[in-house]
Every structure is written in C-alpha cells, then in structure tokens.
C-alpha cells in the first residue's frame, strides 16, 4: 500500500515538473523552437528567455498604472523605467531587493525609539505578592529598558 502511494506521489511530482518546465505542445509539434524564445536587444544573459518566463514577467499592468503615476515624485521605479527606455529584469530585481531591505529595517527600528519591549515580551511574572498603592510595581507589567 505504501509503495503505491509513493509511486503515485512520484508520478504526480514528475508530471507537475514536466508541465511547468516544458513549452506548449504546439511549439513542440511544430519543431520551430525559435518561436518559443523571446529575444531582447542586447548581449546579456537575459537576451533570450523562454516564453514561460515572460508570461510570469508581465509588465503591462504596471506600465498602465505607471502612466498616471509618472507625474508623482514618489515613483522611483517608473522614473528608472523611463530613463532606461523600458524595464530590464536586473533593474527590477535590484529595486525589489532594496524595497525588501527597507521593509525589514522598518520592522527592526519600530520598538527602538519607544523604550518598551513589545507586548509579547512583557514580564508578567513579576507581580508583587502584596499590592500596595505606594509601590510602583503594583499595577504595571511592562518591563522598561535601562
């Protein structure tokens, strides 16, 4: 029973990989593999890409949205695309990496100016046994830095 399950899983994984990596059936039947490649002008490693990559790298919605956002000063990606006369995968990857790095920095810097730990790290185990109105530890469970 387990060998048939493993066989089924193996066949389904192989079928999934073959469906995602092969070109469409009509290109294979025609035998014309040059139509299955998209050519860019330039001699880089991105000069010839399979059509599947271009389908996943569809920039038409971004360009349509960028037409009315091009006047805004907060559109550095659209400015870079205008200067380069079209998008290049290398520039888009560098822009997305930079944006992801800034997102991580914002998360790290959020609690630093406040001086308090987040709610998940508060010290709830230091509740005094005798509650006194004059003591400062009576009602707060917030641990303060320094």
UniProtKB/Swiss-Prot annotation:
Gene Ontology cellular-component annotations: extracellular region
Tissue: Neuron L5.
Propeptide, residue positions: 25-80, 92-146
Assigned keywords, A-Z: Cleavage on pair of basic residues, Neuropeptide, Secreted, Signal
Keyword Secreted: yes
Signal peptide: 1-24
GO biological process: neuropeptide signaling pathway
Localization terms from the record: Secreted
Function: May have important functions in renal physiology and in animal behavior, as does bradykinin.
Official protein name in the record: Bradykinin-like neuropeptide
Gene (name only): LUQ-1
